[in-house]
């Protein structure tokens, strides 16, 4: 495309394939051994009357649990995809600039309006949604122990219960905005 969103997500390796999202809305696989192309699937098709409306980038890093991939596109598609075949397992509307996190039960996404949403990893059904940080420009989420952790534009780090979505704690990490998903190191 002639116009794309600034940034790019990291590729992931699942078994013997490399998988990445691209600025044309496609998710594609390549053989790790020789780079030969495998499957590709259009997850976030461009639509609209002008270049801005047709932005369809997949800039968030693809997340994996076992053989399942989870990816969110700029225009608003959150999808679960089978790594070996590229077959869509489920898809939901979820516009995000910041990405997502995954644990054994749920997929967590920081929405474009700073809402935090949990979807069932298996079915894609909404488990909970919390809008207490609306318009606080939250970072991408991190799944940590029994919490989902995000930062915000004032330097606060917020901890939510991963099962219920209730706010558990808030700490000031500094005066600067938190722009990246919080990093979990071991049990800290």
Predicted regions and their residues:
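Short loop/turn segments that connect beta-strands within beta-propeller blades
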Residues: 31-35, 82-85, 120-123, 161-165
């Amino acid at each position: 495309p002639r116009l794309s969103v600034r940034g790019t997500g990291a590729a992931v390796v699942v078994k013997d394939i490399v998988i990445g999202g691209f600025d044309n809305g496609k998710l594609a696989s390549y053989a790790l051994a020789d780079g030969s192309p495998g499957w590709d699937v259009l997850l976030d098709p461009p639509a609209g009357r002008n270049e801005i409306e047709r932005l369809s980038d997949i800039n968030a890093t693809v997340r994996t649990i076992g053989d399942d991939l989870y990816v969110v596109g700029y225009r608003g598609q959150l999808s679960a995809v089978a790594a070996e075949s590229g077959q869509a397992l489920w898809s939901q509307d979820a516009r995000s600039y910041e990405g997502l996190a995954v644990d054994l039960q749920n997929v967590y996404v920081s929405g474009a309006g700073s809402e935090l949403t949990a979807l069932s990893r298996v079915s894609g059904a909404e488990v909970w949604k919390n809008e207490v940080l609306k318009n606080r420009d939250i970072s991408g989420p991190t799944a940590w122990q029994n919490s989902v952790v995000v930062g915000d534009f004032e330097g606060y780090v917020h901890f939510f219960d991963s099962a219920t979505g209730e706010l558990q704690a808030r700490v000031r990490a500094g005066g600067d905005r938190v722009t990246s998903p919080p990093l979990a190191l071991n049990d800290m």
